[in-house]
């Protein structure tokens, strides 16, 4: 009877540990989750300051300003309807440029400006490096000549 009692207590402790671990994982995931918003969605949502989100859209042409320190940039993200000013301090991806797609991971400050901790430059699925484009063009020309 005592062995049965010990197994029951051990089972209850193991179940409690699994539930506690699951709860802690859920809380940690919720804190790390960053939802994707377009500028229009972000304006409509009236997001609280310091809530991490992913802001996606196009870098507005003529909005990119580089600071003299070489690592800070300011630009506007637009979806064609709304524009949101973004500040970022860090290394800029090679594909980042005006008129291209971008996803900025960060938060709104109490002043209402968006501070990005990371930025991802997006490209369309048809992107090919210049060398590959040249090789494809040469192959196409060769095939047309035959």
Curated annotation (Swiss-Prot):
Record-level Gene Ontology MF annotations: heme binding; metal ion binding
Keyword list, A-Z: Cell inner membrane, Cell membrane, Cytochrome c-type biogenesis, Heme, Iron, Membrane, Metal-binding, Signal-anchor, Transmembrane, Transmembrane helix
Residues exposed to the Periplasmic side: 29-146
Stretches that traverse the bilayer: 8-28
Signal peptide start and end residues: none
Subcellular location as annotated: Cell inner membrane
Regions of this protein lying in the Cytoplasmic compartment: 1-7
UniProt topology in membrane: Single-pass type II membrane protein
NCBIfam families: PRK13254.1-1, PRK13254.1-5
Family per record: Belongs to the CcmE/CycJ family.
Name the record gives this protein: Cytochrome c-type biogenesis protein CcmE
UniProt organism field: Zymomonas mobilis subsp. mobilis (strain ATCC 31821 / ZM4 / CP4)
Upper lineage: Bacteria, Pseudomonadati, Pseudomonadota, Alphaproteobacteria, Sphingomonadales
């Amino acid at each position: 009877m005592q062995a049965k009692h010990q197994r029951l207590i051990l089972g209850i402790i193991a179940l409690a540990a699994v539930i506690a671990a699951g709860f802690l994982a859920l809380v940690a995931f919720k804190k790390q989750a960053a939802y994707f918003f377009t500028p229009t969605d972000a304006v409509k949502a009236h997001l609280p300051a310091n809530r991490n989100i992913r802001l996606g859209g196009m870098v507005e042409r003529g909005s990119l300003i580089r600071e003299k320190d070489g690592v800070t940039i300011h630009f506007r993200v637009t979806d064609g309807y709304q524009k949101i000013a973004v500040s970022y301090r860090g290394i800029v991806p090679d594909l980042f440029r005006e008129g291209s797609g971008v996803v900025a991971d960060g938060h709104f400050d109490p002043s209402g400006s968006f501070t990005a901790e990371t930025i991802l430059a997006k490209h369309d699925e048809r992107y090919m490096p210049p060398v590959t484009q040249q090789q494809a063009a040469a192959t196409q020309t060769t095939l047309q000549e035959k």
